[in-house]
Amino acid sequence: MIIATIGSHSALQILHGAKKEGFQTMVITDNKRENFYKNFSFIDNIYAYASLDEAVSIINGIKDYGILIPHGSLVEYLGKERVDKIETKIFGNKKIFEWEADQKKKMELLRKSNIKIPEIFERPEDVDRLVIVKLNGAKGGKGYFLARNKSEVKEGIQKLIESKMIRDENEVIIQEYVVGVPMYFQFFYSDIINRTEIFGIDIRYETNIDGLRRLPFEYMKELKINPTFVVVGNIPAVARESLLPVALEYANNFVRTTKELVPPGMIGPFCLESIITDNSDIVVFEFSGRIVAGTNLYVNGSPYSWLYWDEPMSIGRRIAREIRVANEKDKLSLVVS
């Protein structure tokens, strides 16, 4: 069996973990990155593509003996139509992709999981406080903007339309901006052992908002630079232990809801992207239904994964172990779609 993934996002971690669990590994990459991946001995096969259609053909070439591990770049790069043409087994529940690509469906899933979320405004006219306007899909924060009132919301949406990032206002979600500190809680759900594991926590390092924070207030006021939220890196974090029971409760609620609304439900890694308020409330503003790039911080294991496994366990390796154990128990169908 060969473990494959697209060359981006968390590919190195995924393939490193797969090799640790005894699998052959394969990266399918843009030909501009081929030389980069040649630097890593744990990657057994490197296939470079010149077009996205060729990428799909390469993936389908291993359908009889391979498993594709999805990450944030899969749908964002290939597009939904091409992903639908993939015949190779995909780790996880690919029905989640559709929910993850739509901000409004995302929030519906969180709400039905009895998870505390920010208020959502259906129309710009309803805005009565500071909001953040977000685009659909895994765009790493690109195009997001803050607005204080309905006029600023309308103005920002119009700029997105003019730049062709969206077609109309239905392609954004207007969300209350919750003041607090960000914490992105990473989890792994195993149907094989019926357990939700809290894996790690990260904070996104975003430009230019994190750079603006270093400026004195009077400079920021004078420069009049609008903050942007493009993710360029990740910072590790450990939460107060008193926060963890609520975070894990939210994760278990989320798993149960996905089983009801998106059967067979959540499989493998996911992330509840949250703000912690000064009342220690965890407010979840988004989820990712697959491996997140913040797990790249923990290639040698996280403070939490050590508590479960007592050995180095990245999410990449955890995925590979789930596949290996499922295959050994003749339950591979439970972890792929």
Curated annotation (Swiss-Prot):
Annotated pathway: Purine metabolism; IMP biosynthesis via de novo pathway; 5-formamido-1-(5-phospho-D-ribosyl)imidazole-4-carboxamide from 5-amino-1-(5-phospho-D-ribosyl)imidazole-4-carboxamide (formate route): step 1/1
Binding residue positions for Mg(2+): 273, 286
UniProt domain ATP-grasp: residue ranges: 94-324
GO biological process per UniProt: 'de novo' IMP biosynthetic process
Binding site for ATP: 124-184, 206
SUPFAM superfamilies referenced in this protein's UniProt entry, alphabetically: Glutathione synthetase ATP-binding domain-like, PreATP-grasp domain
Needed cofactors: Mg(2+); Mn(2+)
Gene Ontology molecular-function annotations: ATP binding; ligase activity, forming carbon-nitrogen bonds; magnesium ion binding
Protein family per UniProt: Belongs to the phosphohexose mutase family.
Protein name: 5-formaminoimidazole-4-carboxamide-1-(beta)-D-ribofuranosyl 5'-monophosphate synthetase
Taxonomic lineage of the native organism: Archaea, Thermoproteota, Thermoprotei, Sulfolobales, Sulfolobaceae
Gene: purP
